[in-house]
Amino acid sequence: MGEKYDIIVLGAGPAGLTAGIYLSRARVKTLIVDSGTAGGQMVMSYNVANYPGVETTSGWNISQTMLRQAKTFGCKVMTQSPVTGMNLSGEDKWVEVEDEGKFHADAIIAATGGVPRELGMESEKRFMGTGISYCATCDGDFFTDKEIVAIGGGNSALEEAVGLTKYASKVTIVHEFNNFQAQPWIVEEARKNGKIHFLMAQDIIEFTGTDHLEKVIVASKETGERTVIPAEGCFIFIGYVPNTSVFKGILDMNEKGELVTDRQMNTSVPGVFAAGDLREKRFRQITTSVADGTIAALSAIDYLQQKADGSPV
């Protein structure tokens, strides 16, 4: 039998790290497992200006502070550690981690967040990693003094486009509608930036190039006229999809693939809780994920106490 923990948290984004902070501070033996780096989607943000009590900083900085807090209180954190199997039913729940084996726990918190939504085009797949990216923080520096495209019209798309002007010589924002879905002040900030240009009501037709991206071809929704945009990089910011495929057939989901929970973050399986962007909800912010992680941790502590007391759970 592998090492036993009180609670295993799947995911080291803001929800998972917050849960880890609360659990470990309560002397609950906790393991956090993540297939990537700590921070989740949060690390993709250049500037975070709306996190209460914190001056404008990067998502990376916030994630590292959260990670240090969790570890300081005694939480074990395993990153770059894909989960290869799990059993979430019954009293003995376990998670199998690549190259590490099985870890057992009395309760599980699912906090695997979301993954960037793709356009679903063959040419998009061809240039992933050779010009096409979904993370400005990760890859922006590679495009210093180059012309790039940013696809999307929401808050993240415009905020990240502004951030990319620190590196790129020109950023062309391509959006499928005539109006942005971003908040007005974010749109105004983008419009005031001399490096940013706009192409509205456009369909993405194709990405072209040889061994790396060279052009983005778009077409007007109104006239069908095509425009070829020279670009060595293209950042796609069209939202996220819940990272819940590993829970399919195990936990109840809605038609969007989001986990269904109650207010206490209980899922359809006793002893399994969910927190963050993978669950069914309207608003997704760092702060809402932190709130979810807090509630999930406290609910999980209640669950462990009820088990110890022999109360129904």
Question: What is the predicted role of each segment?
Answer:
Residues 1-10, 26, 31, 44, ...:
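FAD-binding core/adjacent interface of flavoenzyme oxidoreductases
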Residues 5-75, 152, 158-183, 254:
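Beta1-alpha1 glycine-rich phosphate/pyrophosphate-binding loop at the start
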Residues 20-21, 44, 120-123, 161-163, ...:
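Short amphipathic alpha-helical segments
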Residues 37, 116, 155, 178, ...:
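Short, glycine/serine-rich, charged loops/turns that create anion-binding
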Residues 70-97, 102-105, 166-263, 302-313:
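A Rossmann-like FAD-binding core segment of flavoenzymes
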Residues 118-119, 158-159, 181, 226, ...:
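Glycine/Thr-rich phosphate-binding loops of Rossmann-like dinucleotide-binding domains
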Residues 120, 126-142, 238-288, 292-295, ...:
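FAD-site-proximal beta/loop scaffold in flavoenzymes
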